[in-house]
Amino acid sequence: MKQILLINDVVGRSHVGMVAMMPILTYLGHAVYNLPTALVSNTLDYGHFNVMETTEYMRGTLPVWQRLGFRFDAVCTGLMFSEEQAKLVGDYCRRLAAEGTTVFVDPIMGDGGHLYNGMSQRQVELMREMVSVADLTFPNYTEACYLTDIPFRKEGMDWEDACRMLDAIVALGARSALITSARVNGRNCVLGRRSDSPLLGFSQNLADGPYFKIDYEEIPRAFHGTGDIFSAVAIGHLMNGDNLKQSTMASMNVVSNLIERNREQDDACLGIPIEKCLDLL
């Protein structure tokens, strides 16, 4: 059993963020802890929302944990709401990394070629700083474009451009990268670039080179929180010893099966009720 810390927002009315990730990681055999970056009334797509940042709580909590000697095998960061939060979490992750903790960064910012409602260019800069401390980061294609300043193309990329984008993300400081919701040579896919040395806490197989691409058939139904589900399944498998490509395939299968089972749900903003679907993990 690995000790995993999630640093992300908590949304009151939706299965997204930590609400989606915690039951998955627990089901996969890990002990899960949390440090909320904000309390959010509902997903931002509704147009009306209330957000209470928890920066002061975070600032007070981290020294307490340090004094008590709490240790984590992995930490996964998500949405940051201020420069102060990003610096606080970035410094904490660097300290944990020096102690042997694996750092995962989900640079939550946008989708479909646009930033999420309420996001700004400053958030992009903050996420670049967070990616710089990551053992593994997993942006979607839109977020990868913002991170790398590569223009978003609805038609997607060719393989050479895909590899260049992965290289650009690694150049920010991440040791390995996944890009979800990508489109390469006319096929929907997830892209990966593995480290040329073993990542902390999980195995690699570079016999077929550092890059990989896994195609998938898109289901014409979208839900909030599927990125969080993807991340949680990948982290759970990686921390159980699977390599990056195996973990990516497991995540893709779980997300596909969850969407298929819940495709008749009316409000996509509510996300997927993961607690009712743990058998699909």
Tell what function each PLM region has:
Residues 1-105, 109-117, 276-281:
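Conserved N-terminal subdomain of the carbohydrate kinase-like
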Residues 146, 221-244:
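Short, small-residue alpha-helix embedded
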Residues 12-13, 210-224:
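Short pre-catalytic strand/loop immediately N-terminal to key active-site residues, enriched for Gly-Thr
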